Regions:
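Short, locally clustered residues in the helix-turn-helix/winged-helix DNA-binding domain
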Residues: 14, 42-46, 106
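Residues within helix-turn-helix
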Residues: 52-53, 64, 90
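The N-cap/first-turn positions of alpha helices
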Residues: 17, 37-40, 98, 113
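Short capping segments at the starts of secondary-structure elements
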Residues: 47-51
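N-terminal leader segment of winged-helix/HTH proteins
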Residues: 1-31, 93, 100
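Short alpha-helical elements of helix-turn-helix
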Residues: 7-11, 31-42, 67
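Charged, amphipathic alpha-helical coiled-coil/dimerization segments
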Residues: 21, 71-133
Length: 142
């Protein structure tokens, strides 16, 4: 059976998200990181010293998922956490190993971006990215 076009926005976006994730995971397959983990490194490269909550908000994920993903990359020695403004808060940054992993995997990530654009078209990829970001920001705002 082939992929079905569904009448539901949620289901269709989830189909797309799974397909995109599979593409990126395939390209990153022999690395030690999953797409979700590389995304965390990418976010911390752009904005170091984010709190767990700020990282979750920035990525549009829940706190539990952020905590779990951060624990995995910390265990790999790619990020370090330091106390935040209160005892419960943790701030996260890349370690030198995290910086190196980010640089090492960046060409693969760019290859995944290119593969995505080749499969659906560059203009369509850009339009989808803009529409997805618009939806995420408007829906997150309530």
């Amino acid at each position: 059976m082939k992929l079905q076009s569904l009448p539901c926005y949620c289901a269709t976006l989830r189909q797309a998200a799974r397909a995109v994730t599979a593409l990126y995971e395939e390209i990153l397959a022999d690395s030690d990181l999953h797409a979700t983990q590389y995304t965390v490194l990418q976010a911390l490269k752009l904005v170091p010293n984010l709190t767990t909550t700020d990282l979750a908000v920035a990525l549009g994920i829940d706190q539990t998922t952020a905590t779990r993903t951060l624990a995995l990359v910390r265990k790999s020695g790619l990020v370090i956490d330091t106390p935040g403004s209160d005892r419960r808060e943790r701030c996260w940054a890349l370690t030198s190993a995290g910086e190196a992993a980010f640089r090492k995997l960046k060409p693969r990530w760019e290859a995944a971006q290119t593969a995505f654009e080749k499969r659906i078209g560059r203009a369509e990829a850009e339009a989808l990215k803009k529409a997805s970001y618009l939806a995420a920001t408007k829906l997150a705002a309530g």
